[in-house]
């Protein structure tokens, strides 16, 4: 018998609301108010999300953010910066004690990401986990280099994912780009010289890919969304039951957005959860 999970999908939201809703789901599951949950979401503006410990000063080009009318938000998870634009974003909240969650962070990620692997297969893309850790230090830009066990297609990183455990609950969320505006992405970072920017941009093209690039044609969001819903359902052996948020739940989301994801929380490391 398939286990029943909640499935949440809503209209595109701004950066603070999207991050606050992920955090709220973690709280609600910890309190037993919702079952394990899979969420799909989108962004109403291009957004650069930065890792919990990632520096802004000297790294992020705030003029570039303004130029491209992007939003900037700090995630509750670690890792490098991700440009969210033409993509499907997902999140999973589940208890650390759940039988599907390994005690090892790496193994838990590996197990949960099998649903992502299956979804790519349904789309006609063969992906695998990177089996060698990067020999270089962490980049400011996600997708520039795959970390150990992250997903790659023909050696190129195709999905960026991050995980955190708080109060006995695991939250994993990730970016599934259909396409990527690399010119915009590199305008959002500071570089010592234009030559270095161009070198890094070229290297990025060699190391990162997207769904559209792999399939050679533009895919509809609906096709990608359906593949990922099926992929997670099959591999995790779950039945997804759609839910909607109550007015009170939305109020809580807006409160979290204001307290934890406002502009005041961008420069320094925020303290929440």
Swiss-Prot record:
Matching entries from InterPro entries are given as: aa-tRNA-synth_II/BPL/LPL, BPL_LPL_catalytic, LipM, Octanoyltrans_LipM/LipL
Protein name, as recorded:
Octanoyltransferase LipM
Ranges for domain BPL/LPL catalytic come to 32-240
Question: Residue numbers for the site described as Lowers pKa of active site Cys?
Answer: 157
Protein's organism = Oceanobacillus iheyensis (strain DSM 14371 / CIP 107618 / JCM 11309 / KCTC 3954 / HTE831)
CDD domains per the UniProt record, alphabetical: LplA
What domain of life does the UniProt record list for this protein's source?
Bacteria
Query: Which pathway does this polypeptide act in?
Result: Protein modification; protein lipoylation via endogenous pathway; protein N(6)-(lipoyl)lysine from octanoyl-[acyl-carrier-protein]
**How is the quaternary structure described?**
Monomer.
Query: What role is this protein assigned?
Result: Catalyzes the transfer of endogenously produced octanoic acid from octanoyl-acyl-carrier-protein onto the lipoyl domain of GcvH, an intermediate carrier during protein lipoylation.
Location of the active site: 142
Which Gene3D superfamilies is this protein grouped with? Answer: Bira Bifunctional Protein, Domain 2
Q: Pfam families, from UniProt?
A: LplA-B_cat
Instruction: Name the Enzyme Commission number(s) assigned to this protein.
Output: 2.3.1.181
């Amino acid at each position: 018998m398939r286990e029943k999970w909640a499935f949440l999908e809503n209209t595109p939201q701004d950066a603070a609301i999207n991050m606050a809703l992920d955090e709220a789901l973690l709280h609600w599951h910890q309190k037993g108010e919702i079952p394990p949950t899979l969420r799909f979401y989108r962004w109403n503006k291009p957004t650069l999300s930065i890792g919990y410990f990632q520096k802004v000063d000297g790294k992020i080009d705030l003029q570039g953010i303004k130029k491209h009318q992007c939003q900037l938000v700090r995630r509750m998870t670690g890792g490098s910066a991700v440009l969210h634009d033409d993509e499907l974003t997902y999140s999973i909240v589940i208890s650390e004690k759940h039988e599907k969650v390994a005690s090892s962070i790496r193994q838990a990620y590996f197990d949960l990401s099998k649903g992502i692997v299956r979804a790519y297969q349904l789309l006609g893309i063969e992906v695998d986990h990177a089996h060698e850790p990067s020999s270089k230090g962490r980049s400011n830009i996600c997708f520039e280099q795959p970390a150990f066990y992250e997903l790659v297609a023909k050696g190129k990183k195709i999905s960026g994912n991050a995980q955190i455990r708080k109060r006995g609950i695991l939250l994993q969320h990730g970016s599934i780009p259909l396409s990527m505006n690399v010119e915009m992405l590199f305008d959002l970072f500071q570089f010592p010289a234009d030559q270095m920017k161009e070198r890094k941009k070229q290297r990025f093209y060699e190391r990162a890919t997207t769904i559209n690039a792999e399939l050679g044609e533009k895919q509809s969001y609906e096709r990608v969304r359906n593949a990922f819903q099926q992929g997670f359902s099959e591999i995790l052996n779950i039945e997804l039951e759609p839910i909607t948020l109550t007015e009170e739940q939305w109020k809580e989301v807006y409160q979290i957005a204001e307290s934890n994801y406002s502009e005041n929380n961008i420069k320094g490391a925020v303290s929440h959860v």
